[in-house]
Amino acid sequence: MFSPSKFRKQVNESESVSNCESTTSNSRRILDQHAGLPISSAFRTEASDIGHHFSTKMYFKILSPNNVFALMGDNEFKTSFKIFTIFEPTSTPNGKIQSLITISYKINNVLFKMEKEIFIEKVNIFSLELHIFNFQSTNRSNPASESIHQLDLSSEALVTSTLNIRGNKITTTLRPRTSPYKRAGDASMSREDLRSPDSVSTFTTVLHVFHKVFQVAATYTIRENRSERQTKVKLESLERRLKANEKARKEIEAEAEKWKDRATRNSKRLPELELELAETVQAKEEWQVKSQEMEIQNKQLVEELNEVQKKLEEIENSQKTFHQKVVSTLNLDEEYFQNPDEEQDGSLSQFNMDVLEQEIVKYQEKCISLKQENEILKEKLQQLSSSLTVNQNHVSTLMDHLEINKEQSREIQGICKKEIAIRQDHENRINHDVTLLNSLINEQKMELEMLKAEIRCLRSYSQEMSQSNKNNIILLKSAETERKSLLETLTVLLNSEEEATENNVKRTIRDLVRERDTEQTKRFEAEKAASNAEGVLLEQAKQQRNALFRARVSEEEYSKSMEKIEELEQELLASDLERKNLEHKIASLENCISKVSQLLNVNVGGVFDAIFDRIEELIAQESVYRVVVNENRLISENIFRGLQSVRKDFQSGKSGGGSDKKQPASPVAAAAKIIQERHTLKTIDKMDKLNKDLLATMTIETLKAADIEKTNLKKRMNEQDARIRQLEREKKEGERIRSIIAKWEKRNIPKTEKSSPMKKVPPIENFRAKSQTSITGLSPVL
């Protein structure tokens, strides 16, 4: 007989001594053949290698449950699980094969070793040829590793644990395809062999294994049913989300169309504003040209006034000389008449004296009247000079106003350019927002398509699960029939009439089953708790990752929203400054209008009708004054010609008096010349009127320009107010769209995220709402 203790001593001695020759050549050859073979690969030896007791060949296959355990483990376990035969197998008198093997495996990079004394027995139970291991000896641990865990391959709890972890593979590998035994029986196995106690123990182990397999299959069918219900619930929730997403998509598309319409309207308004700007620039240039022309005309009129004054001075000088000459001539005549010649007659001299006296009286009266008229004309000249100074002052003030208006027009042009640039920026931003909304709509469409595809996959998966459940039900029914057949065979085997009684067999079976059940339940509960703990930890890790990702996204969006708020505040400040500048310009224009009304002696009172009436009167008088000016020019030319003729006549009369003293100068011509001087006074009056008309026309033009600028400013202010209202409406619509998107995002948040530990983190929509409220609280312009 074989003794394990003696063999262990021999093995230790052989390991301590190098190149030991105690082992036989056959054992060395078997070790070399089977060293390092994994348990999943079956090995075979011939009968000649085992011993001389068998003349036929026998095959040794390492099968259930060990190869199942190796197949179901991870890759590390599969590659490291190895079995070695230590000595040459020997046959016992009972027909069994006795051997000692070592089993080694790794779990988590920890090496485990164990030794087993085995008896191999050939039993034909299934359609396949199955060799069962009867592990009769206790575990013998390696002395080098005392604290290492030892795996008991004889226990069925390990098999059930692996079945719980890898249930699908176990059901496919261990599911019996035929009846538990052949009813007809094999030629190599008799009915007496079936009733032996060893065969009964083997059958009990096999029955226990199949019972556990069926339990695992039932648990997996329950789990599949649960997963089927969960998939149905998920399908319903996904359909609800699809409907909500479609509604939100329609609303967003409508909002995007509105934004597009507004963008087109703004683009249509731009050319109109540009045309208005061009018109204002042209009007300003025309006004500048007219002002230059009026300045030139004013200079010409001043030059003409100076020429007329010079002519008046010359006329006064000529009048004085003429008066002196008349006096001198009169004195000469008196002397001549006081000392008459004796040759002349008395009657003729007396007649001439009477005529001269009458003429002199008339002439003196005319001189007195002319002196009075000259005094009146001098007073009028003084008035004209004072009015000229006043007019010059008015012209200087008007020129100052013109320069101020030029500066204001330049500022207005700059403001208009800035406003156009700002409007273009706003339109670009609106277009950018429209593109973003379109991209969001496209992304949501893609998400909807993805959700539809997921729903289709889930439906197909649910159909597959239902089919697999049906197949599992069929397999369970077949397993139940097979279990019934096994129970029948066991009843047949237990009702045998051999040495072992039925009560003893039942007691042993019950004890074994109780022990195994208790161990299996404990291990199953421990493994179940471990798997539940692992699932909880995985869910917590996923929730934490999702929460961190959402927190990062919220921080990024918060920073972006703060940047947008700063930009909007800067735009607000710029718009406030522009409004203040416009108000200042309006006030300056109102002051200009009040000054113009004071100059025209018109009470405006907030209404410009009086100014416009006065302007129309001055325009009507302008045409009349132009006609009068032309007439005055003709009259002045005629007067000048008459004066020249009078001067010539006077010179000719003087020369005649020197040669012939009897011929006196004609006083009628002198009187005619004096009468013509009255026309000069009329020309002076007309020049005064012309100066007044010039002032009136200048003031009218300045008032017209100021009125045009004021109307333009009012239009711009109204346009700015309309633009501000439109921006407020667009802002409200944008807030409404954001609220819709926020609601949609809240609906799409899964339950796992809602129950995550990061509930206290505020969502992105709160930051958006806060930023928007802060913007609206700054000023009502936005």
From Swiss-Prot:
Keyword Coiled coil in record: yes
Disulfide-bond pairs as recorded: none
Biased composition (Low complexity): 13-25
Coiled coil, from the record: 223-331, 348-398, 428-601, 699-743
Annotated region (Disordered), positions in chain: 1-25, 175-195, 748-782
InterPro entries to which the protein is assigned, alphabetical: CCDC170-like (IPR039139)
Key words of the record: Coiled coil
Superkingdom as given in the UniProt entry: Eukaryota
Keyword Coiled coil: yes
Compositional bias annotation for Polar residues: 769-782
Biased composition regions of type Basic and acidic residues, renumbered to the chain: 183-195
Official protein name in the record: Uncharacterized protein C27D6.1
Species of the source: Caenorhabditis elegans
